[in-house]
Structure formats: structure tokens, C-alpha cells
Swiss-Prot record:
Known role: Converts seryl-tRNA(Sec) to selenocysteinyl-tRNA(Sec) required for selenoprotein biosynthesis.
Protein name: L-seryl-tRNA(Sec) selenium transferase
Entry keyword Transferase: yes
Domain of life, per lineage: Bacteria
Family that this chain belongs to: Belongs to the SelA family.
Amino acid sequence: MDPRSTLPSIDRLLRQAEARELIAHHGRDNVVGMLRRLLQDRRMAAGRGDRAAGERAAGEGVLDECAERLAAQARPSLRPVLNLTGTVNHTNLGRALLSRRAAEAAFRAMISATNLEYDLERGTRGDRDSHVEALICRLTGAEAATVVNNNAAAVMLMLNTLALGREVVVSRGELVEIGGAFRVPDVMARAGCRLHEVGTTNRTHLRDFANAVNEDTAAFMKVHASNYAIEGFTAEVPQADLAALARRHGIPLLIDLGSGSLLDLDAFGLPPEPTARQAIRDGADAVTFSGDKLLGGPQCGIIAGSRALVDRMRANPLKRALRVDKIILAALAETLQSHGDPERARAEIPTLRLLTRPQDEIRALAERLCPPVHAALSGLAEVRVVDCLSQIGSGAQPVDLLPSAGLGFAETGAVPVSRIAQAFRDLPLPVIGRVHKGEFLLDLRCLEDETPFLAQLDRLALAGPA
């Protein structure tokens, strides 16, 4: 008998209790559609002479397989993972983790109407920047501030507003490319201004900027080269000197800090990073930086500077296209509040807390985790406690690395390193590490709660070579 003729009808399957449970959870249309696809798959497999399919063609396990497929279909594509790569602000893994206060503020804004653009005192329309502007100005020393959806957008809005159709002078050594082949010259072109590059890759002097000024010059721009470093025979123009030259010529100095920082990181024992406050103090007329990198907040781009320039940017129609919503503003406001006190910021903001985590603490965690991980591997791979180096990530301080510790997995001949990495990614809560010098490495700097990691070790599916 042709096994395809024994497949049950959809009506018959739908009368079973298991199907009714699936319908209650997933909806009738989803269940019926999945059953049709599943039965069609079985018919086609049986028609090709697939023996296993023939044995299953009588309909055994159809509803179980349907339940599995529906569960997989319903699983969110965007999932939590454990970031054990050693890169604290990993762009591909979502960058900064929000503080609890920021996350709670975002949640409150999500589930309620808010005074996003409503002045409660006057009973009139308000400005959404009002919820964060005073905080940004207090932390940077700027006269005014506005927020858009990321730092590239902030740079684009700034240039489009202040230099449309005109030249912006930039040092050749600062024409950076950030992730995804996104280059400063491309942003400038899209903003509608013309790049006038000066100096050389490794050395640019104040006279290079002075000689570049002409009637078409709209601004000087300085871009912090946060994702690479040039060492050796180098020279760059100090911000204060460039600001003074800009003032003499009646043009603004614009600074893109990229990752940016509101705190002096060297006070925490971290590599120093330019701060927005110092840029404003040195005479910058407008400064842009990210909210989800060293700031440790939600993704956004912050522009701080003179009242006159920021007001012009707010009046640009692009501002509406690039504006942030109430969720971002709620999270950003709480993050900025935390930055009001450096020690509070380090305690509350995960990015700062993780970056300043002592190596001894991380090594102690590695020593606790090594025995249960070794047991879960069943001898298929070697695991040991290793010292390693973490990095800040998201283009910040690429040369300066942070002493850390973790678990290193070496091949024994039974299982290749690539399969070990895959096994950890396949866990219910995927664990993302990195391969370094032939070993799979889990840098434990970002693992503050080991319980979820340990709870799923029994699900670690390793096998020998296929």
C-alpha cells in the first residue's frame, strides 16, 4: 500500500485534544497552515522513496511535530544571549546594557501615556528635548542640547544644518570608517556638504586649517579616531587651538567624539577618552557623541553646543525624521541622572561596572565554573582557566585592553573548536565566545550572574566527529 494514502486528514487531526491545545495557544489558522505544510512534506518524502518518511506516513507523531514547528516559528528572532566575547560593548550583540533604573523608566514610558511633548505647567505643546536637555547641559557645560536616533544621525543633522552646499575642513587622518563600511566622507556627502581634507594621514598642523579657509568654508570639523590609533611620527591640532582659529575666521568648530564620555575614565583606572565637557571647555561650538557606548544608555546621538546652533538644528526638517521616542528619552534621562555622580554611575551603569571589574574577581569566577563545565564536556574537550584581555568595544580605545580571565577550550581530537563554539551557541540561552589562537575562549568579564549559565550546562550537546 502506498504510505501516502494512510496520512490522516486535517479534520481528523483537528478533532484530537492535542490539536485543540495547539489552537488555543497558536490560533486555528496557524495550526491548520502548519499541518498542511507538514503533511505535504511527508507526502513528498514518501514519494521520493524515503523509508523513514514511509514509516511515518501513517500519521504517527504528526501533532508532536506540528507542535515543535509551531514553537520554533513562535520563538522570537531577537533573543537574549550571554556575551562572553570579551568585548563589553559588542555592536553585534546590542552594545550597552541599560541600568535597572533606565530599563524601568523605559518600561513605564512604554505602557503609559506621557508628557512627551506636553507642558504640564502651561497646558500647552512642549518640546521632547526638554526631558534631557538640562541634564546634558549640566554634564557637558553646553548651552543647549538635542537628541536624535544615533551618532551618525547627529553628525548628519549637524552638517546638513550648518554646512549645506559648503565646505567642511577635516584632517585627512580623521576620515574614519566605522562599522558596516560607514565612512565620515559618505556621511558628509549625504548631509549635502563638501569635504575639504587637509594635512596628511599621520600629521596635520594648525597652518593646514588656516590655509584651507576660503569664502566657501562653513566649518572646521574634528573627528575623534576612536576605533584605531596612529603611532610614531604624528601630529594633530589641539581642540583649543583649532577653536581659536575658527573664532578668528567666524566659523564654528564641530567635534564628533564618536563613543564619547561624560566622565574622566582614567579616574576609574580605565584608558582616558575625550569628554564632551572638555570639548566644550576648549571652545567647540557643537559636539556629538553616542548614547549607547561609553555613556551606557540607549541607542541615540547627542548634540551639545551653543544655543544658536542647536536651535538651528531643531528647526531643520531632518530633526523630525531623526528624532527619538519616549522610550529612548526615558532611559536616557535615568542614565544621565546616574552620571551626575561618578561613583553612582559606576555602581548603576552596567557598562562602567563591567569595564572596572577587577581581574581577580573574574578569575575567581572562572575557577568556580571550570569544574562543572569540565564535567559537562564528558572528556570531549579540555577546559582550563586562562588569563585573557577584554576590550571596551564599539570603536572605543581599540589599542588599550583590559586584563581579564575566562575559560579556554582546546581540541582533544574528539571535537573541533568550531563545534565547541557551536554547542555553546545552541544552548537555550546562547553563549557567545570567541576563537583565539586555536582555542575557544569564554571571557567571563560580562558574566555577573552565573546561575543561568550553570543551569543549562546539561543541555550542552557535544559529539565526536561525524
